[in-house]
Amino acid sequence: MFCEKPTEKREKSPCRCKNCVLRHSDFLPWPEPIGFTSDRKTDKDNNNHISTLQSVESVVTISDVNERHTTNHYKNHQSNPDEIAYTPNRSGVSSPVNDGASSPTQRGGTTPAPQGGKGGNSPSRVTAQPQAQPTILLIVVNKNDPPPYGQGQSWEYPGQQYSVPGPRGYPGPGPRGYPGPGPRGYPGRGPRGYPGPGPRGYPGQGPRRYSCPGPRGYPGPGSSGRPDPGGGLQGYYYPPSGPGNGTGPSGRPRPQNENEYAYYDRRRYSEAYQNNRNDWRGQPRGYYDGAYAEEHNLNRQPETRRNCQCPEKQQTPPPEETQNAQENDDQQTTKRKSFKRLVGMGVGNTCSCQGPSLMGSNLRSLGNEMDNQEVGRSGNMGTPPNTMEYLSERGSPPEIREVTVTDAKNKTYKCIQVPICISTGKANTCRCCKCAPSPDAENDESFDEDAECICNHEGKCTCVAGNEFPTEFGCECDLTNLEQTLRELIPNAECICYLKKKKRRRKRKKWAPKVYYDRFAGPPFVLNPKPRCLDYGRSPFCNPCYNPCSCAPFAKSCYTCDYNCEGCGRF
């Protein structure tokens, strides 16, 4: 039987994993990747915030230890030429170095030489050098605009050059101690404390609010904020007008609506505005809530008239002036004043009259004619015409119209203007008043005891004889105060809301003392108020007290009836 040759056992390659258990201590671990090393270093720096930088002594100590470790490594592994040596460095990343070859740092790379091998007999000493870190190059480009008055030219003295430019590209000081231009193209200060040019080459504001000369011979803004020709307000820089009509400072076209945004109102120079109320500059202003504004910027609203009267189409001719008529006029004036006092002046906005105001004119003319007829007749008793019939002859009353009224609190009311008898309903449902017999005996034949009467415009009954009474009679209600006020207010729309809310009667609970219970007693009993035993007559506890106070008929407490006698002796 043939024996097979024993298989040669392959030599296990030494494990160089850093955390492997089978790795011998003599074998150095594999180097970690550069990116992973930098991440670990970053984590380590984040964990140790206090010690961020290593001192010089620690660096020297680490370098000495690395040199000693490298020397020992070459002494131990000199017999094995194929073994790769690893040189630690300060950065914590070890780079592989072949024996007898130049170091990777000297070649500029981190990988061993491909032809490394048995080139040399004695290893050369490799110095530990820090690995090159990546460099981030940040380039900042500053674009310097050209100065507004020429490169190197002085603003005050054109033609004279400035001195040598300053460091880092900044302009140096001007000649004779004058300040140079500002940094990065901005204009500097002017000479002798005067301000320099403004932005974009326009003149700045002078000292003590005096104007500075504008560029190219144009005048600058005036002093104290008043605009000079071509200037503007204080604190603002107005560019001068261009050479041509309709162009701006740089030859740009002006906007078409530029006149709308002008500072002053050109209409104030017209003759139509001379008689108006102007301010100290002669410029009309609109006043609104204590502040004023320009008239062309604020739409002026008409002034609110509190008691406006709607225009009447037909005005009755005034009656003949008599003494009684003057008295009636005085009475009507007094009534109007009282009604205005009732309505309240100064409350509410303007009224908007809708529809014709025939009703108010008819009622006023009707009242005047009735007064004249009463005055013309003998005595105070007159026969006024029927109101409904009179209105039917003159024309049907206008339709009901609504007028919206807003008071000072912006609360809106709708006042409905209607004819009389609004409180009782229609006119034919009103009850007519009866007249008493006439005191004059001469007029007994012509006077009817069953004579009826109507109410005049003042709400008073006026007796009418039977013969003179109209055949078709429609009764008219007695005017209440509300109806008189409404009649006087028609067509004036400033009304008062007479509708009052009904007050709900508040039901008052009967007073009873608050009851406190002893909830922990069994059964719970009342603590306050204490229950009283109305025990009238002789008390059963009189004899032991020998005190007549307990024998009186009074309310006693069931709990303290034994102690109702103060200071009484007991057996």
UniProtKB/Swiss-Prot annotation:
Where is there biased composition of kind Gly residues? 217-234
Which lineage? Eukaryota, Metazoa, Ecdysozoa, Arthropoda, Hexapoda
Q: What is this protein called?
A: Uncharacterized protein CG42266
Q: Which cysteines link up through disulfide bonds?
A: none
Compositionally biased, Polar residues: which spans? 88-113
Q: According to the UniProt entry, which residue ranges have a biased composition of type Pro residues?
A: 168-184
- Which regions are flagged for Low complexity bias? 205-215, 311-326
Residue segments, region Disordered = 71-128, 142-258, 298-336
